């Protein structure tokens, strides 16, 4: 393989172990990334700024590690021993993060409150957990690169190692998303990743020991990256690179002395467009697939697969072509590949004849999603993957740096661009200029990268050729920019249902925000629907209005003194509006993660939400509801939660045992909590998990049903702080008061004419449902089991079947839940019987 630093000689037979080591290292890194983002999101929140802090810190550590550690760790050190130390350090850091995070969370909550939880404090927490391991991760490839000679074949070998590392990322994404976290939990996933690190470290030490016993190469055994005709001195003193297809010094294609900076800039632009595209296309594909944990893992795996395969192709091309010219060609072709992906995602994939509502195994739909993702994004991913080894070989042609430092520089430039691209796209571009303009910007950036890559090769004798190339790049990029389509409004609204949606509804509003795309539709009969995550989230249809009003009115009418109220999730604002019109409420805080939702609630659902946006006693906080509750110093008399569907990635954090324990700790004496649980687009196991987890924290909880003509649809879970029963007479007396006229009218609009009608939606308590809940999995912060269970049923519509199996047979009237006069209790009994 060439001369290893520290006097160690490694020959060709050791390349396969090095590939395996980098594969294991990449697999572990992706598992860690998934686990750390999941766990840290529970601490600093899942809002877009918090997610940006996590991503920026993670990738920033990689960048610093690749750039700094190869300089600090001299080339005289045995690189395999250094690699082993890095892998062991990563394993130690991974285990440390898992075990010290609870203490960090406690300190964070103690330092921050909902008003002072600044980005700086969140960044500090992320840095404490992520910087040490990611700095070590960033140095692994540059350190191993010291095992090759600085020549064309050597840089090709580094490209293969990068390809192996990326292929490991594919395995890590699939293992984490489809097995380790679905079947086990974050702890098991961490231990598995640490085991891979230790295995890679031991393998490196074994190779170092074996190789050290044969310092002189055996006769007839070729050195890796050291064919005689390909020799290039590390110091850059060689006269030429004469490998087949290699660049020839003195020709018009040979880089100038200062051209390495152009190559670094090209690598940065390539990284920027790659991560910008990944962020944007993941958002758009999630609309079409349903934003489940499975969909995100699949999209990431396809993208990484393209990068890995492309890196292998680029490593081959680095030996057979002029690397700078090939790099320029890749960037030029990326203009077309980005345009293709934009067209495929907006104009092709949404209209493939797939009916997701047909009964089918989730595996079948995942196969279709895999094909669709590859069809759209694989071409671009292949080209981005090929760009790294080509940039490395092009920079290496300049000489002047040992392989570890040079690899670290190119890696750092690529990673720095990736940081800029991901953060700029997710936090600024998509929100300010939209998805279409963002993709147009990516095409323009790729065109600039193509010109930069070729610039060092231009000589006076080739000015005409250079001018023709530049003209072709600019003209083609300009044409492609004009051809980028907008995402169709119906796709934003209906997502995976686009091919089978009914005709008639008009999309009257669309918006792209930090967390996704949103829409409002109007049916011919005037019914309005608010869409998020590619499906209806709220509407003015009777069954939806009934559920949203139940969430709010049940909570405030049952609570002793509902002065301070927290509503998690604004949506159309109907639940928040229901609590806001209660005359007893003095302060209503609405925690909403997406700022774009405010405009929708204010402009389109004002009549239904009682003008909640703009109500002087309502405070709108744009934050992850869980994070706001954890950092708030106040206690609340009412907490009501109406999150996204539990199969939406991240929503399950609002259904965990730890979350309900947090809610219980924030409830004032006599306080009430309510939460929405859907029975449709879910599985029975998922519903059992939701209800069992709630009852685990609130043993006195109760289920209130929202049915459609007697059939199950969704339910409201309710619990009180303490064991006091619900006073039916008190609820009835409140509704009879003149100041409660708006509340009574609001309830009549959805079919509740009395307190008995409202409380008669009772469907059962913990004891009643004990047999049905037996064996249900508890959803915890460590396992987030719910998002995996629910993700298997997002296209299932078994609401009534689940409701029928859930209902207790012959259950007695809940005397411990309700209290009141005999007449009032008889009214509730009759209402329950009518249901």
Q: What is each stretch, according to the model?
A:
Residues 1-724, 728-734, 788-825, 830:
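Alpha-helical transmembrane segments of multi-pass membrane proteins
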Residues 390, 771-773:
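A structured, mid-to-C-terminal "fold-capping" secondary-structure block
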Residues 733-758:
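Short, cationic low-complexity segments
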Residues 762-767:
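Intrinsically disordered, low-complexity terminal/linker regions enriched in Pro/Ser/Gly
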Residues 775-776, 781-786:
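Periplasmic c-type cytochrome electron-transfer domains
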Residues 833-835:
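Amphipathic alpha-helical repeat scaffolds of TPR domains
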């Amino acid at each position: 393989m060439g001369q290893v630093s520290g006097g160690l000689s490694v020959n060709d037979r050791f390349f396969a172990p090095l590939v395996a080591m980098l594969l294991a290292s990449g697999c572990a890194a992706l598992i860690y990334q998934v686990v750390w983002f999941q766990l840290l999101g529970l601490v600093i929140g899942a809002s877009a700024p918090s997610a940006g802090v996590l991503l920026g810190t993670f990738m920033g550590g990689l960048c610093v590690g690749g750039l700094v550690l190869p300089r600090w760790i001299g080339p005289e050190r045995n690189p395999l021993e250094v690699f082993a130390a890095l892998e062991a350090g990563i394993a130690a850091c991974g285990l440390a993060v898992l075990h010290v995070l609870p203490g960090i969370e406690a300190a964070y909550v103690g330092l921050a409150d909902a008003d002072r939880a600044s980005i700086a404090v969140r960044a500090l927490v992320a840095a404490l957990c992520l910087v040490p391991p990611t700095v070590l991760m960033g140095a692994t490839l540059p350190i191993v690169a010291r095992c090759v000679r600085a020549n064309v074949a050597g840089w090709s070998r580094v490209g293969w190692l990068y390809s192996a590392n990326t292929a490991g990322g594919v395995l890590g994404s699939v293992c984490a998303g489809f097995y380790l976290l679905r079947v086990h939990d974050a702890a098991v996933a961490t231990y598995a990743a640490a085991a891979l690190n230790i295995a890679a470290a031991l393998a490196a030490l074994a190779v170092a020991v074996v190789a050290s016993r044969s310092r002189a190469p055996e006769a007839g055994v070729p050195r890796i990256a050291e064919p005689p005709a390909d020799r290039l001195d590390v110091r850059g003193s060689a006269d030429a690179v004469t490998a087949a297809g290699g660049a020839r010094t003195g020709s018009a294609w040979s880089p100038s002395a200062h051209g390495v900076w152009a190559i670094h800039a090209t690598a940065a632009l390539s990284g920027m467009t790659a991560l910008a595209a990944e962020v944007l296309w993941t958002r758009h594909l999630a609309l079409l697939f349903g934003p489940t944990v499975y969909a995100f893992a699949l999209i990431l795996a396809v993208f990484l697969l393209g990068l890995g395969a492309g890196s292998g192709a680029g490593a081959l091309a680095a030996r057979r072509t002029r690397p700078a010219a090939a790099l320029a060609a890749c960037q030029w072709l990326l203009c077309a590949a980005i345009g293709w992906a934009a067209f495929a995602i907006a104009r092709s994939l949404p209209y493939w004849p797939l009916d997701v509502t047909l009964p089918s195994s989730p595996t079948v739909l995942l196969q279709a999603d895999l094909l669709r993702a590859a069809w759209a994004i694989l071409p671009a991913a292949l080209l981005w993957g090929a760009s790294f080894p080509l940039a490395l070989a092009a920079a290496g042609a300049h000489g002047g740096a040992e392989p570890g430092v040079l690899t670290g520089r190119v890696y750092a430039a690529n990673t720095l661009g990736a940081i800029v691209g991901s953060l700029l796209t997710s936090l600024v571009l998509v929100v300010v200029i939209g998805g279409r303009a963002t993709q147009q910007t990516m095409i323009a950036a790729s065109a600039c990268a193509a010109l930069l890559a070729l610039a060092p090769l231009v000589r006076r004798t080739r000015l005409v050729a250079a001018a023709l190339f530049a003209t072709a790049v600019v003209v083609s990029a300009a044409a492609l920019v004009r051809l980028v389509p907008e995402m169709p409004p119906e796709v934003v609204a209906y997502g995976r249902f686009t091919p089978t949606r009914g005709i008639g509804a008009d999309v009257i509003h669309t918006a792209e925000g930090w967390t996704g795309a949103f829409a409002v539709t109007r049916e011919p009969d005037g019914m309005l629907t608010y869409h998020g995550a590619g499906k209806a989230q709220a509407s003015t249809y009777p069954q939806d209005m009934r559920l949203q009003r139940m969430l709010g009115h049940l909570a405030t009418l049952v609570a002793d003194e509902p002065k301070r109220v927290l509503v998690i999730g604004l949506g159309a604002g109907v639940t928040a509006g229901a609590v806001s019109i209660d005359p007893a409420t003095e302060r209503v805080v609405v925690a909403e993660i997406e700022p774009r939702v405010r405009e929708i609630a204010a402009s389109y659902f004002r009549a239904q939400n009682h003008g909640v946006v703009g109500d002087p006693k309502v405070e709108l906080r744009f934050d992850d509801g869980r994070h706001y509750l954890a950092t708030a110093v106040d206690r609340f008399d009412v907490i009501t939660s109406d999150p996204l569907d539990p199969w939406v990635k991240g929503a399950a954090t609002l259904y965990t045992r730890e979350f309900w324990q947090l809610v219980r700790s924030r409830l004032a004496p006599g306080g009430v909590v309510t939460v929405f649980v859907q029975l449709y687009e879910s599985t029975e196991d998922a519903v059992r998990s939701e209800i069992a987890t709630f009852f685990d924290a609130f043993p006195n909880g109760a289920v209130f049903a929202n049915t459609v003509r007697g059939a199950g649809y969704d339910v409201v879970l309710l619990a009180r702080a303490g064991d006091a029963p619900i006073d039916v007479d008190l609820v009835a007396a409140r509704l009879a008061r003149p100041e409660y006229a708006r509340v009574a009218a609001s309830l009549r609009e959805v079919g509740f004419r009395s307190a008995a009608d409202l409380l008669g939606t009772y469907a059962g308590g913990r004891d009643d449902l004990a047999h049905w809940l037996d064996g249900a999995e508890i959803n915890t912060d460590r396992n987030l089991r719910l998002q995996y269970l629910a993700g298997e049923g997002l296209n299932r519509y078994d609401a009534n079947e689940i409701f029928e199996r859930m209902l207790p047979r012959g259950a007695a009237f809940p005397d411990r839940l309700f209290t009141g006069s005999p007449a009032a209790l008889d009214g509730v009994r009759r209402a329950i019987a009518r249901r």
